[in-house]
Amino acid sequence: NQCIHNGFGLHTFKEELTGPEYAARYIDMIQEEKIPFKLNTMVIDISRDRVVTAVNREDGLFSVKAGAVILAMGCRERPRGALNIPGYRPAGIYSAGTAQRLMNMEGCSVGRKVVILGSGDIGLIMARRMTLEGAEVKVVAELMPYSGGLKRNIVQCLDDYGIPLKLSHTVVNIHGKRRVTGVTLAQVGTDRKMIPGTEEYYACDTLLLSVGLIPENELSKGMGVSISPATSGPEVNDCLETSVKGVFACGNVLHVHELVD
């Protein structure tokens, strides 16, 4: 629901939908089939014999014995702590998805002068979104020599708004104690190490991080599912069954997909 931009459904429904419209199609399908579901419910454990333990306000702690379990936990954003960026920890540093939720669902402005690290699709879309909300996006920096987002998003979100994209660049310092006051970018070589003398300072009050997604597999690991080092998701057979009998995986928990369709 926080993805209020369009571009969804082109492959599945053969029409262009916003995120909430796309989600509503599947909600309607579930209701039409009268499939029971529980909202605001957190699964805290799945055993190898497929007993699912969950908790919510209405039922408290409860368990369900399943004949089959489908893992569909999705993925999460890589946090700042995984990036080893020097500097203080001031206010004004957000993952792109957090900023997206704050702006689109909570109605909060996260900043006025913005630098974005990473050119994943969420980061590119947020560059456009923040520009439309009146913020100034100074630059989008990408560590790799190529963008991590779709070509159409580079054109529609950066080129159309004159937002510069610096490839083979990364943030090497964050300035500011209470609030971000600026960041220093530098060019990196093929070994991804900073090239001395290429530092550039950008004054800003906000840094958005769009540095990749990680399949959410804590539950998978807890039940002993084998994880692929290539995808960070479960290893599956041709039927998408994991190494645990009767447990299947799909979607972004299996591997990060470029398109929701």
List where the protein language model places each region.
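Iron-sulfur-cluster electron-transfer modules
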Residues: 1-60, 64, 68-85, 89-92, ...
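Beta1-alpha1 glycine-rich phosphate/pyrophosphate-binding loop at the start
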Residues: 1-25, 29, 101-104, 110-156, ...
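A Rossmann-like FAD-binding core segment of flavoenzymes
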Residues: 27-56, 64, 131-218
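A short, basic/flexible loop-to-alpha-helix module at the beginning of a structural domain
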Residues: 58-61, 98-111, 192-199
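FAD-site-proximal beta/loop scaffold in flavoenzymes
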Residues: 71, 93-103, 206-254
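Glycine-rich dinucleotide-binding loop and its adjacent helix/turn
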Residues: 75-115, 119-124, 230-238
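Anionic-ligand-binding alpha/beta catalytic cores of soluble enzymes and soluble regulatory domains
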Residues: 257-261
